[in-house]
């Protein structure tokens, strides 16, 4: 095999499997794969070294693996385990496949593979990460159907009675027509067509997404399930119909539709940011880039029955230009996103790239410039390139901002934010929630402590909107920790209460929930008086609306799922109507 072709094959292998794990050694913005100089690989093949992978056909059975925290993981058409038998009579300390230090070496290793629309092989390298030398290559292994429909992810449509299903496959529209078969549980089903998207290397804005990180994303399909009954159980499966009439199916999934806006029922929402991904086979033990990611995922999988919708508020996969990592992420959250609406926000690691219209002139997206997030996931935005949107869930109104585009007064997004807040019917939807990735409010993270405890220009334009429209809670990520403020306005607490808030909406509570999984961020040494609770750990927030007057907000750690901080809001409609401070409308007396 020519070295050029070999390099291409090894990039495919490395990005798809073993390498997903290695090396976040230094640098806040690094992607682990960026540490591997795979483009410098030279041939050093030896007859004395060999690898053999088995089985060669994957995804033909269903097994159950039980991990710590009793996480049951199903393999099938999209995920499976491979055993790699390695022999090397001339071991060196800088040899690597995944993570090991060889001595006299003959070993059997196990790797978990996901279906990425192609076959796989394993390779043994010497020379470390910066000067890799190819020593041996295994046989090929492949899934029984590499093109199968996989990794469904649900999201709200643009109306409360619409659910969207997005998934990935290897089938273009000319190969097989995509659709979803769905219906109320136990009743007859109907079929809804799906649209198909993809993109090429030329859509990437720079490297590594356009260079060593590029990988064909396959085809992304989205179907719109409309006219849903409120609070009802539905089942669905993904299908592709070939020209001859035969159909390839996914397995059967289920979801519960949204309540009618304003419906008085138990409603539970999970919020976190900055989760990323990790590998269950241990291949990232060399350096954990998102060490809390699997704990957060597993806690949410184990608790599926106890929440209704998820908001992942930016920094989704941390692919940073290594395209294969989006498949890895969608596979990791499949058990969640296939059952619950999985609503995402745009973060710096999804969008930012110089001279592409992002508000920050940074390179955090690795050249993706928003294309991956906008294609791999659906959100009910008018234009997904402008990643702001509103969505309703029962008694909640969510206004989701895009911190990577201009939000300051007079901007297009500012007008959207005001319209979203102003149009909420607080008699029916008392719980008004604002969210963005970067901290546009308050945080005492180490970096923000040097910048007035906010993103530059963060709250100056927005705070008057939060006050005018009486926003209950503002959620942010970006800083990898948890922090909760008092109800606050213009840097001043508007209540001395710590946990139980009631009466007039006189300030917005700011919650930083960026500890979803990526490496943690330190706090400033000084804790401002508005900072009620801080935690340097991984976790997520769960909101529970019991009715129109009672809301519980809990912060849970990913390590044990226990509650470490909480607060409640008790409020009647007249409290929402009441004016506060300089936000009172003018009044007069009638003539009679």
PLM feature segments, named:
Residues 1-4, 590-592:
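A positional/structural detector of protein chain ends, strongest at the extreme C-terminus
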Residues 2-145, 282, 287:
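Extended, solvent-exposed regions of the mature portions of secreted/cell-surface glycoproteins
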Residues 144-512, 516-523, 532-534, 542-591:
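Metal-dependent phosphoester/phosphodiester hydrolase catalytic core
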Residues 527-528, 537-539:
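C-terminal structured "cap/appendage" subdomains that terminate the fold
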């Amino acid at each position: 095999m020519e070295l050029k072709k070999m390099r291409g094959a090894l990039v495919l292998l490395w990005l798809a499997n073993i390498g997903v794990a290695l090396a976040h050694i230094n640098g806040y913005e690094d992607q682990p794969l960026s540490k591997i100089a795979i483009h410098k690989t030279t041939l050093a093949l030896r007859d004395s070294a060999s690898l053999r992978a088995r089985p060669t056909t994957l995804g033909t059975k269903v097994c159950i693996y039980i991990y710590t925290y009793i996480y049951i993981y199903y393999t099938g058409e999209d995920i499976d385990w491979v055993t790699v038998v390695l022999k090397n009579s001339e071991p060196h300390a800088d040899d690597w496949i995944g993570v090991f230090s060889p001595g006299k070496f003959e070993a059997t290793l196990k790797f978990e593979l996901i279906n990425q629309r192609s076959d796989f092989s394993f390779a043994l390298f010497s020379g470390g990460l910066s000067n890799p030398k190819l020593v041996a290559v295994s046989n090929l292994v492949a899934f029984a159907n590499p093109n199968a429909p996989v990794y469904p992810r649900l999201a709200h449509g643009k109306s409360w009675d619409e659910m969207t299903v997005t998934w990935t496959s290897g089938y273009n529209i000319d190969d097989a027509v995509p659709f979803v078969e769905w219906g109320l549980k136990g009743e007859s089903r109907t079929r809804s067509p799906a649209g198909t998207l993809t993109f090429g290397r030329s859509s990437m804005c720079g490297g590594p997404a356009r260079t060593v990180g590029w990988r064909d994303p396959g085809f992304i399909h989205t179907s719109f399930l409309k006219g849903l009954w409120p609070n009802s159980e539905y089942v669905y499966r993904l299908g592709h119909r070939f020209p001859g009439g035969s159909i390839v199916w996914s397995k059967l999934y289920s979801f519960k539709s949204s309540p009618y806006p304003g419906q008085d029922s138990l409603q539970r929402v999970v919020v976190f940011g900055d989760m990323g991904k990790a590998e269950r086979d241990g291949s990232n033990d060399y350096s954990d880039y998102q060490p809390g990611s699997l704990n957060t995922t597993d806690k949410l999988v184990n608790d599926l029955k106890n929440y209704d919708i998820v908001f992942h508020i930016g920094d989704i996969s941390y692919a940073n230009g290594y395209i294969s990592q989006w498949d890895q992420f969608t596979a990791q959250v499949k058990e969640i996103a296939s059952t619950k609406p999985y609503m995402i926000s745009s973060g710096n690691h999804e969008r930012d790239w110089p001279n592409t219209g992002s508000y920050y002139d940074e390179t955090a997206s690795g050249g993706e410039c928003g294309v991956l997030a906008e294609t791999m996931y659906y959100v009910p935005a008018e234009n997904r390139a402008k990643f702001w949107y509103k969505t309703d869930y029962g008694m909640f109104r969510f206004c989701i901002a895009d911190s990577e585009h201009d939000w300051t007064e007079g901007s297009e997004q500012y007008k959207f934010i005001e319209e979203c807040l102003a149009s909420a019917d607080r008699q029916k939807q008392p719980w008004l929630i604002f969210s963005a990735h970067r901290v546009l409010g308050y945080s005492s993270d180490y970096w923000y402590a040097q910048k007035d405890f906010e993103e530059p220009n963060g709250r100056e334009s927005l705070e008057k909107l939060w006050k005018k429209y009486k926003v209950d809670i503002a959620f942010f990520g970006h800083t990898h920790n948890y922090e909760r403020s008092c109800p606050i306005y213009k840097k001043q607490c508007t209540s001395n209460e710590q946990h139980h808030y009631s009466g007039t909406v006189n300030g917005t509570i700011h919650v930083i929930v960026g500890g979803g999984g990526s490496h943690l961020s330190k706090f400033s040494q000084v804790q401002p008086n508005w900072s009620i609770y801080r935690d340097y750990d991984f976790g997520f927030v769960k909101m529970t609306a019991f009715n129109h007057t009672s809301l519980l907000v809990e912060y849970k750690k990913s390590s044990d799922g226990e509650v470490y901080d909480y607060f409640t809001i008790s409020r009647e409609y007249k409290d929402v109507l009441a004016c506060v401070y300089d936000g009172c409308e003018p009044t007069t007396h009638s003539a009679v």
